[in-house]
Amino acid sequence: MPGSANWTADRFYIPDTLANWPWPRAINPAYEECKAASAAWCEKYGAFSARAQKAFNLCDFNLLASLAYAGLPADVNRVGCDLMNLFFVVDEHTDAMDARSVQDWVDIVVDALHHPHTPRPAGEPKVGEIARTFWENGIKCMGPTAQRRFVETFTTYLQSVVTQAQDRDKHLFRDVDSYMEVRRDTIGAKPSFALLEHDMELPDDVFYHPLLEKLREWAIDMLILGNDLCSYNVEQSRGDDGHNIIRLAMLQENTNVHGALRFVSKMHDDLAEKFLSNYQGMPSFTPQIDAWVTRYIDGLGNWVRANDSWSFESWRYFKGDVLRVQAERWVELLPPAPKDELTSSIPPESRWIKPAVEPSRARPNNVGIVALDTYTPTSEDDFQTLAVKTVSSLLSKYNINPVSVGRLDICIERAADPYIIYALRDAFASAGNTDVEAIVSSSKSVVGLFNAINWVESSSWDGRYAIVFAGDLSSGVSAALVGPDAPIVVEPTRGTYLGDPIASTDEAQGSYIDSLFQSYSHYRKKHPQFSKTSGAPNGAHTPTTTNGSIKSNGFVSGDTNGHANGNGHVQTRSSTPSSSSSSTSSPSFDYMILHDRHGKIPTGAGSIYLGLASLITDIAPETLAGKSIGVFGFANSTSTFFGIRVAGDCSVICKQLQA
């Protein structure tokens, strides 16, 4: 590196980390042919605006593939070109997404890889069809082992992109070691290396030999450092350098960009020395396997050279200044990019997934119930099986990736099943997700719902959903998915009443009614503008059907006076039939129809959700839209009155509840 006298605050020097690298630059002879075919394939999906497509083409990701796969057959090189284009379509679009949206995107791509011969559904984000057609062509020139390793490593790559988005959403800056651990997947090298095996059948004990594992890691780390050295200037200009080792080294080492460059250059030199000292040290197996191993390691070394050559030959990082930078290696620090340029590369029609949470907001909007499912127990169901069935059904019906769930709130009538957490754990662990907070609450179903909502709205939220499971064997169970941008929004105002303990069954009815009026009174003091005269139903968590409609009894406009009897309990003017029925004309009974299907539900932990499910299925979505609904929850004299608002279309939930 040049002397420090030449360094200034507005320019920096990129060291030549491969000056003594023994692999020379080479290019696949089918480069031009593959470039034309792959570019046409990528462009037909309209992933970018016309202006951005032109810039995308100047980056020439086909050149990167043709440098990396210089010695491979033309058909494999074409697949490599398609892969590089797919990588950078993913990179450009997910950089503008929040973590939840990236996870939705990832689910589509993974599904496409597993169904390469099945056209994607109409209206789905285009990335699904891009990934499907890529892999449909890719499997034609890759053997079974290479195919398996590609799908495994590409899936890992995609999940790491979600992690990167989570870091971005939380403005998280990792230390260098933690960053390298994540970046080894986000750089996409592992699936790229799978193409080197296109005609090989390396046994797992050879492929995962400790030395070959280290050679792969050292090669990947050199790719990371080389890429970040060249991409830093563009990324710092966009304010997107939180996932770049130069920025992280500056923070960790408390230095400026020049000090960080020295730090990273030394890291690269150490890695190169390790690779060159060990790449010929693999033990011997069979002549065929030895030949494959030698060719594979040669491919790793060539990849390091290819990435460096492409970085200084395409317009990706240095645009029209690429030849000067290649010769001199001095880079002028770019000023911050205008905000309207940060997403201009993506046309509005191609911003395929709407972000769930805008990073500029302090907390997510419209937090509530995103999805809902219920289950009626049979005589053969035990509670653990019932819980797994219901949660699994929710995930399946709404096509929810278990990895996108970060919290479980379990509400049960009695804390009689301490192993329910372990039963539910398997539904997530089988998908590779053991990073799930799990909390058990007894009796009061709204506690789980409020806890889940508070988590989503807190600084601890990591961008994933929460699931609230509630119920018991006698009344039925439910599972609710809680997250932002929900069609059923739980309003923040709550009225809570902590009454006297219930000593007997005879006291329960009076305590229930007293708690209803007291909690509603507290609610109105906090939210006086709320009115039940809007025509919306009122849902009550009712221990029996004899409690009837809470619209009656002067329970309008906060009139809770004149209803207490000599025992201090609130009496009702009975206007309720002896049983609930779907034919009743009172809208209040719509919320209690499900009670009839499950028998006379006691103070079951899941009855609020079962009543809500009844409301959604029995009232047309267009009628419910925009309505505010009062909800009352009660458990052993502890009660809460709160409101929910139907902020979106409930038709999907309605359809799935009836499925």
Swiss-Prot record:
Residues 574-586 have a biased composition (Low complexity). Keywords: Lyase, Magnesium, Metal-binding. Terpene cyclase that catalyzes the cyclization of farnesyl diphosphate (FPP) to delta(6)-protoilludene. (2E,6E)-farnesyl diphosphate binds at residues 316-317. PANTHER family: BETA-PINACENE SYNTHASE-RELATED, TERPENE SYNTHASE. It is an enzyme of class 4 (lyase). The DDXXD motif is important for the catalytic activity, presumably through binding to Mg(2+). One of its GO terms (molecular function) is metal ion binding. Belongs to the terpene synthase family. It comes from Cyclocybe aegerita (Black poplar mushroom). The lineage of its organism: Eukaryota, Fungi, Dikarya, Basidiomycota, Agaricomycotina. Residues 528-586 are annotated as: Disordered. It catalyses: (2E,6E)-farnesyl diphosphate = Delta(6)-protoilludene + diphosphate. Residues 530-573 have a biased composition (Polar residues). Mg(2+) 1 binds at residue 91. The gene is Agr6. The record marks 88 as: Plays a critical role in the stabilization of intermediate cation. This is Delta(6)-protoilludene synthase. Mg(2+) 2 binds at residue 91. GO terms for biological process: isoprenoid biosynthetic process. A motif (DDXXD motif) lies at residues 91-95. Pfam families: HMG_CoA_synt_N, Terpene_syn_C_2. Its cofactor is Mg(2+). Mg(2+) 3 binds at residues 227, 231, 235. It comes from the Eukaryota.
